[in-house]
Amino acid sequence: MTLGVFHQVYTRPKATEEAIKSFRQFHPDNPYVLICDGGKSFHRISKRYNCLYVHEEDNLGYRDHTHSSGIYGMTKEEVLEWLRRFRLACTLCNTDHILMMEDDILIRGEIHVPEEWEFAGQAKPGNLLQEPFTDYLTEKYGVEWNVNYYGTGGGSIFNAKTFLENYERVIKIFDEEFDYIKENLCGNLGWVDVWMPMYYFLCGKQYRH
């Protein structure tokens, strides 16, 4: 099993460095893709910790319920761009699995991922995926759900090869269905801990935690 890292950052260099440092303590040579989300340059930190650095001009970010736009999370266009960046990281790392790192994640030991794991996050039975949403994907795309909740936030691990192999097919579904699902079936689809389970369930995979 080989493991790479996808880490999107913005304007918190001190937190970013602590997160990278914690990973490098146990995995000094693993490929690590650092993507700046339209913020300040992280080139110096990237060079110091042997990361592959990509600077994107557009900031994706998130919006909470209080945002003046009325948008919750990300829009379809922003999610598609996020997935493009994730695909880039998977391609650059060229590993079996990829860790979705965030600034508030600290690694406390060497990471060993079972080869059969497809996507793994937190066990959060309280984060229910509503039946109209799950039923819709089951009836239209044959999705089989081994859990009815979501939880793939920072620190989650994904099978990178599965992501790449299914990208063109699943991206087409996201492009066609995202707005309808977000507006009618799953209002929090604009958050990564929801859209990534949707992606992998559309690949026919099971959630681990």
Please report, for each region that a protein language model flagged, where it lies by residue:
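Short beta-strand-to-loop acidic/aromatic patch adjacent to the donor-nucleotide binding site
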Residues: 95-106
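Conserved catalytic core of nucleotide-sugar-dependent glycosyltransferases
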Residues: 107-184, 189, 197
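N-proximal low-complexity "stem/linker" segments adjacent to membrane-targeting elements
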Residues: 1-21
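Conserved glycosyltransferase catalytic-site signature
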Residues: 79-86, 103-105, 189-197
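Catalytic donor-sugar/metal-binding loop of nucleotide-sugar-dependent glycosyltransferases
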Residues: 197-209
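Short, charged/polar "capping" segments at the starts of alpha-helices
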Residues: 14-16, 39-45, 129
